[in-house]
Amino acid sequence: MTDRDRLRPPLDERSLRDQLIGAGSGWRQLDVVAQTGSTNADLLARAASGADIDGVVLIAEHQTAGRGRHGRGWAATARAQIILSVGVRVVDVPVQAWGWLSLAAGLAVLDSVAPLIAVPPAETGLKWPNDVLARGGKLAGILAEVAQPFVVLGVGLNVTQAPEEVDPDATSLLDLGVAAPDRNRIASRLLRELEARIIQWRNANPQLAADYRARSLTIGSRVRVELPGGQDVVGIARDIDDQGRLCLDVGGRTVVVSAGDVVHLR
């Protein structure tokens, strides 16, 4: 057993339920499973069968078919990450605002881990739309998928992976100097932060957008956006609009991007 293996005890489902499920909480159900293909796919399947997944949390110790944006895989090591999906009812919110939900999730993840890591604020933040970066490495990612009347938000947060266990451009809490990251505490804090940000999103609270802009590493940067159709656009990221889209200054004209992969250029 390696030192990292010793830092990978199982999650305590009962404790998480005791902390997060109850009167006044937005979370109605929480389950921890040893292994699944994809927590997002599992909640989407429940929604398709007619189940009410609003406020449902599904956490997996290991994912064998995790997915990132645009159909890419999400690497996973057993008990080395926090891998979870939640269901959010969205039909009572204007569809134009749905794009901000995944941005809110990224902000919640960032807020849950930023106090733990000794990284200057200028090196920790959000890459549009919702990647959590620290020292240039990807620490966490979000995948939002619609299954009306719900959106399923998936979170993958790297906790104790070694460099060889993650993609070259990724990092983990352990490698950022968190000596013994406690996944139970982090998961609990993350879900509390996520609940608070969902409430802000649902209420159209302007503080959500203000906080996101303050923590954005993309706004003000020269970027290349790789669009889903295979084209690229290069410009200065100026803002995020009220639909969660990235607004670029491209040679003096504004180009609005709703989906794509951002590369920060030097």
Curated annotation (Swiss-Prot):
Monomer in solution. Forms dimers under specific crystallization conditions. Pfam families: BPL_C, BPL_LplA_LipB. Catalyzes the transfer of biotin onto a conserved lysine residue of the biotin carboxyl carrier protein (BCCP) domain of acetyl-CoA carboxylase and converts it to active holo-BCCP. Forms an acyl-adenylate intermediate. Cannot use GTP or desthiobiotin. Residues 14-202 form the BPL/LPL catalytic domain. The keyword Membrane does not apply. One of its GO terms (biological process) is positive regulation of cell population proliferation. GO terms for cellular component: cytoplasm; protein-containing complex. Binding of biotin and ATP significantly increases the thermal stability of BirA and leads to the formation of a high affinity holoenzyme complex. This is Biotin--[acetyl-CoA-carboxylase] ligase. It is an enzyme of class 6 (ligase). It comes from Mycobacterium tuberculosis (strain ATCC 25618 / H37Rv). Its EC number is 6.3.4.15. It catalyses: biotin + L-lysyl-[protein] + ATP = N(6)-biotinyl-L-lysyl-[protein] + AMP + diphosphate + H(+); biotin + ATP + H(+) = biotinyl-5'-AMP + diphosphate; biotinyl-5'-AMP + L-lysyl-[protein] = N(6)-biotinyl-L-lysyl-[protein] + AMP + 2 H(+).
